[in-house]
Amino acid sequence: MSLQASEGCPGLGTNVFVPQSPQTDEEGSRSGRSFSEFEDTQDLDTPGLPPFCPMAPWGSEEGLSPCHLLTVRVIRMKNVRQADMLSQTDCFVSLWLPTASQKKLRTRTISNCPNPEWNESFNFQIQSRVKNVLELSVCDEDTVTPDDHLLTVLYDLTKLCFRKKTHVKFPLNPQGMEELEVEFLLEESPSPPETLVTNGVLVSRQVSCLEVHAQSRRRRKREKMKDLLVMVNESFENTQRVRPCLEPCCPTSACFQTAACFHYPKYFQSQVHVEVPKSHWSCGLCCRSRKKGPISQPLDCLSDGQVMTLPVGESYELHMKSTPCPETLDVRLGFSLCPAELEFLQKRKVVVAKALKQVLQLEEDLQEDEVPLIAIMATGGGTRSMTSMYGHLLGLQKLNLLDCASYITGLSGATWTMATLYRDPDWSSKNLEPAIFEARRHVVKDKLPSLFPDQLRKFQEELRQRSQEGYRVTFTDFWGLLIETCLGDERNECKLSDQRAALSCGQNPLPIYLTINVKDDVSNQDFREWFEFSPYEVGLQKYGAFIPSELFGSEFFMGRLVKRIPESRICYMLGLWSSIFSLNLLDAWNLSHTSEEFFHRWTREKVQDIEDEPILPEIPKCDANILETTVVIPGSWLSNSFREILTHRSFVSEFHNFLSGLQLHTNYLQNGQFSRWKDTVLDGFPNQLTESANHLCLLDTAFFVNSSYPPLLRPERKADLIIHLNYCAGSQTKPLKQTCEYCTVQNIPFPKYELPDENENLKECYLMENPQEPDAPIVTFFPLINDTFRKYKAPGVERSPEELEQGQVDIYGPKTPYATKELTYTEATFDKLVKLSEYNILNNKDTLLQALRLAVEKKKRLKGQCPS
């Protein structure tokens, strides 16, 4: 990887080395130096910027990067819009820069003035390698009702030139000549360079641990001593109660072993605040208490290992010691596959090569680089998908094709089949019929006892214990327990990480379970992100951030594990993966109507870019990825209330966000890996992306696209052949069509869509390939339809007149027993669907073998094109 210096930029890029990496050309790319119409700069003629140590964007790399001092001077506004019809605006400006501090600062309020002038300055310490976007919110102060939020300006600080004053006039409403005038100054910080870890999208900053011990100055009974309320702003813990003790404290004493710990970013200008207990005094019959204000102490003056003593009133002392946290992260920042998965693939290749030689009757063994990566991709559909998947897998097993697959991906009801099978470490090498018989026993049994009072009391106790462990209990956890009782006889202690036993020798395909990460108050149209689970890791492929599966649900800060929580039992994961209750009303409307844009647009905030061409062409342009300056105007009270109702998710699954504290790299939008999955409105608003959220809100993928393709389309996996098993209700081709459209928009190699949309004209199997695109996978598509099965009970074996009734499988009729909402089937209904699915696989053996040959030939052809 070569390094190049950015040329001719007086801003943050001067003398800074940046890694050269592949980029994708996107329409509307926001690269380039641009100024507002009234933007000006003033050179302060100060010395050069210290160099930056290079950090590679595709791996997890460390490097040193300087911090800078930012001064923001809010000067004035002109022609402020009126929030109230009867009076002028009581205007103030709020400043929020979450990459420097979570605290919002504000100017004073100037009442009844259309042209307020503040001339107030605010200081921040910022890190030059993260995307710093300042939010300037103009508000109208109200004494009785909540303040009115008039608008917010989003300003990318990458535009600022180092050691140059930048004077900006933001044209907020050109028609009304409304204008906000602000001045920026970026200077050197006295702090030493900060150690960063980054993958080119996310950045982990330096973290310290503050140990706090309280000591009582006076001898008193322990029961009379009061806890001290200690807060460290910007820390993970924020506020803790510290119990004072009587023993003297030193750095090596046992006191610090039981001290309260606060994890905080070292260069965030954090402060410790201590609430002073009330002091009581009496005079005769009168007894009074007196409370003093909190005591504050900046932490930037506290050196590593140094113990600082802070007097707290007359009765207590606070002893504090700061130690650096390990630079090694517990979150893996990187886009490559984890070592455990790479090791599995090496073992699985041996199994696949042997199976392909037997199935295709090859004369010679396949070389390691000639073995295609074959995957089975299942969609969702409740009990229908679970049942049908058993039949499909049985058919593949009878054709000896299960050993040819390296991956199985699924969502929703398909995960019920996958999780059940992977309880057996050798399931794919055993006859599946006993497992299918066991599944039938549970599908046909009465589900009502699962809701009896004694069972509900057990659920309540389970959920209470889960809450005590540290999880946020939601309705989907109850749904997971219900699935467990409906599909099993007893409590299942298995966990996702336990499925590694089924992969230890490469004996089974690697299972990947897919969900989407959403926001509680945002429609899926505006925001959703692919979130994958495997026995090895869980994570978000867009950010290149993964954690071991046994740590999912634990608490992290800045990439470091700060509180471990016991791993969830698999039933809770099943509730999450098939969380059919997590839809909000707007998403439900979008799924059932074609006119969703009316409600979607009407309830949205108004967003507009306000920057024009620069008037100072002599100022050089920066190569950094700069966001346009944007004005966000909130919706009306009515539209906000309506949207709040429409987008509220009552039963969404919430888990602690393992990206908490991490920040976005200044060039995250230019990163090709991020761009590959950048598909939502909020991707250009870094302060609103997942790293800034406290919790992950995970949802059944079927509410967006009912397919589990994305994990297989990662360039690190690069599947050569995907066997698409479809189980959705309604249009059988819709998930495939949506995937094709999505891949076209995202420039992801995928075969072209050329199938009829009507279910009546569909065949049992389609072979799709794109010879013009060598990186596109071959796809064999199996819609869930009843075609030749009506007349044939096995390939080439016709049904007798008495057996014709067995071929009548009503999958999608108005009275179908296979509706997604149905959890219980009759034995005959279950058997028909399993046999239909098995038949459709067996009857298309030739198409499957053709696809396998094409995959092998493609692999050999690509090998021949590679230089030796």
Curated annotation (Swiss-Prot):
Q: Catalysed reaction(s)?
A: a 1,2-diacyl-sn-glycero-3-phosphoethanolamine + a 1,2-diacyl-sn-glycero-3-phosphocholine = an N-acyl-1,2-diacyl-sn-glycero-3-phosphoethanolamine + a 2-acyl-sn-glycero-3-phosphocholine + H(+); 1-hexadecanoyl-2-octadecanoyl-sn-glycero-3-phosphocholine + 1,2-di-(9Z-octadecenoyl)-sn-glycero-3-phosphoethanolamine = 2-octadecanoyl-sn-glycero-3-phosphocholine + N-hexadecanoyl-1,2-di-(9Z-octadecenoyl)-sn-glycero-3-phosphoethanolamine + H(+); 1-octadecanoyl-2-hexadecanoyl-sn-glycero-3-phosphocholine + 1,2-di-(9Z-octadecenoyl)-sn-glycero-3-phosphoethanolamine = N-octadecanoyl-1,2-di-(9Z-octadecenoyl)-sn-glycero-3-phosphoethanolamine + 2-hexadecanoyl-sn-glycero-3-phosphocholine + H(+); 1,2-di-(9Z-octadecenoyl)-sn-glycero-3-phosphoethanolamine + 1,2-dihexadecanoyl-sn-glycero-3-phosphocholine = N-hexadecanoyl-1,2-di-(9Z-octadecenoyl)-sn-glycero-3-phosphoethanolamine + 2-hexadecanoyl-sn-glycero-3-phosphocholine + H(+)
Per its UniProt entry, what is the enzyme's top EC class, as one word?
A: hydrolase
Cofactor requirements of the protein:
Ca(2+)
GO BP: any one term: glycerophospholipid catabolic process
Q: What is the effect of changing residue 412 to A?
A: Impairs localization at membrane structures and N-acyl transferase activity
* GO annotation, cellular component aspect: cytosol; early endosome membrane; lysosomal membrane; plasma membrane
Q: Indicate which residues the UniProt annotation says bind Ca(2+) 2.
A: 84, 140, 142, 148
Highest taxon listed in the record's lineage: Eukaryota
Record localization: Cytoplasm, Cytosol; Early endosome membrane; Lysosome membrane; Cell membrane
* Occurrences of domain PLA2c (ranges): 324-856
Gene Ontology molecular function terms on file: calcium ion binding; calcium-dependent phospholipase A2 activity; calcium-dependent phospholipid binding; N-acyltransferase activity; phosphatidylinositol-3,4,5-trisphosphate binding; phosphatidylinositol-3,4-bisphosphate binding; phosphatidylinositol-3,5-bisphosphate binding; phosphatidylinositol-3-phosphate binding
Per UniProt, residues of the C2 domain are 46-170
Spell out the activity-pH relationship. Optimum pH is 8.
Q: Which SMART domains match?
A: C2, PLAc
Q: Residues annotated as region Disordered?
A: 1-46
Sites of the modification Phosphoserine? 800
Disulphides:
none
In this chain, the stretch annotated as Required for localization at membrane structures covers: 857-868
Q: What is its main location?
A: cytoplasm
* EC id: 3.1.1.4
Inhibition and activation profile? Stimulated by cytosolic Ca(2+). Stimulated by anionic phospholipids such as phosphatidylserines, phosphatidates and phosphatidylinositols.
Membrane topology term:
Peripheral membrane protein
- Alphabetized UniProt keyword annotations: Calcium, Cell membrane, Cytoplasm, Endosome, Hydrolase, Lipid degradation, Lipid metabolism, Lysosome, Membrane, Metal-binding, Phosphoprotein, Transferase
In UniProt terms, what function does this protein have? Calcium-dependent N-acyltransferase involved in the biosynthesis of N-acyl ethanolamines (NAEs) in the brain. Transfers the sn-1 fatty acyl chain of phosphatidylcholine (fatty acyl donor) to the amine group of phosphatidylethanolamine (fatty acyl acceptor) to generate N-acyl phosphatidylethanolamine (NAPE). Similarly can use plasmenylethanolamine as a fatty acyl acceptor to form N-acyl plasmenylethanolamine (N-Acyl-PlsEt). Both NAPE and N-Acyl-PlsEt can serve as precursors of bioactive NAEs like N-arachidonoyl phosphatidylethanolamine also called anandamide.
**Know anything about its domains from the record?**
The N-terminal C2 domain associates with lipid membranes upon calcium binding. It modulates enzyme activity by presenting the active site to its substrate in response to elevations of cytosolic Ca(2+).
This protein is called Cytosolic phospholipase A2 epsilon
**Organism, per UniProt?**
Homo sapiens
Gene designation: PLA2G4E
